[in-house]
Amino acid sequence: MNVFSEIKDAIERAPRNSYVAELHLQVIKFAEVLENVSGKEFCEKVDLKSAWGTEFTKMKKIAKRLRAAGLDPKKI
């Protein structure tokens, strides 16, 4: 399974009221792999509306700071 499929599956399995939180967690978890992926490409690969590209970009930036502070993304 590729990273985009894994993210899409996780988002689809999330409870309706946790959809956005799951999206954020998945981007943080896979931020290093997604480093060179644009918001547009991410949305296309995960079948999200293009507006989610902004959230994707924000979470990639936050992920760098979280990793620098000691977060282990493998535990997400």
Predicted feature locations:
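Short alpha-helical "recognition helix" segments of helix-turn-helix
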Residues: K40-V46
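Major-groove recognition helix of helix-turn-helix-like DNA-binding domains
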Residues: S50-K64
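Short, Lys/Arg-enriched anionic-surface-contact patches
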Residues: V3-K29
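Short Lys/Arg-enriched helix C-cap and helix-to-coil transition segments
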Residues: K60-I76
